[in-house]
Amino acid sequence: MKVISIVNLKGGVGKTATAINMASILATEHSKCVLLIDADPQANATRFFGGENAPVKLCDVFTHPDAWDSYCWMTQVDGVDIIPASMDLLQLDVAAATADAKLIQNFADFVGDMCDESDYDYVIIDCPPGFTAVSIAGISVSDDIIIPAKVDAFAISGIDELTAQIRAVQTVRSGIRIAGVLVTMWHNAPVVTQGEQYLRAMDVPVFETTIRRTDKMDEATFARQPISTYSRWCAAARDYRDFVDEYLGKEAADDE
C-alpha cells in the first residue's frame, strides 16, 4: 500500500481536485483500490462524495482510534472509499499544538494497521492548507508528497517554505519522497509561462504534466463527478489522466 499526501501551504490551488481526480482515475482506469482521507476541515472532498452524514469522521481517528474499517465510507466511484472530515479538525489542531502529541501517533498507528490489514493499493490524504498538526500527521505517514501549485508569485514563493518543512519531517522519517510539484490551472499567458519556467528552475521536482484551466472543472464539482467521468475528453480530464500515468511511471522507476 502506498500513502500519498496532497499538500500546499495555500488554498485555492487545486489540492482537493487533485486528490479526488487522482483517486478516481487510479480506481476506474488502473483497477486500483483507493482510500481518500479528507484531512481538510473545510471537508470539500467529503461533501463531493456525500460523506457529510457518516457516523464517524477523521477527527475520531485521532482522538478515539478504533478498527480502521469502521471509518471508511463507500463513495459513488467504484473502488474509492473515503474517511470524511469535519470542522472538528480545527479543534484537533489546537489540542495537538498545545498539549497532546499522542494524537499524531494515534494517526500513525491507524495508518500502520491499515497498511498491514487492508486491501487498499493507495491511500490519498487531502491535507489542509498550511503546516498544521493534521498536515504534519499526514506527511509523516506518507511515502510520497504531491504539491499542487497554481503558477503565481504567492504560490511559488510558498513552495520553498513548504519543501523546507517537509525536509525537516524527512529527518525523522527518511522514507518520505517529494514526488513533485503539479502545476494546476495552467493557461496560455506570458506571466504563467514565465512563472512555470521559474518553478522548473527551483530545487524541487516538477511533473512534466500540467493541468489546464477549464470551466468544466467547476461544472464537474457542482455535478459531484470526477472530471474524467463528467467530461472525459476535456483538457483537464486528459491532463489528469496524463498526470496519473506520469506519477505511476515515476513510482515504478523509483521502486526498481
Language model features with spans:
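P-loop NTP-binding core
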Residues: 1-256
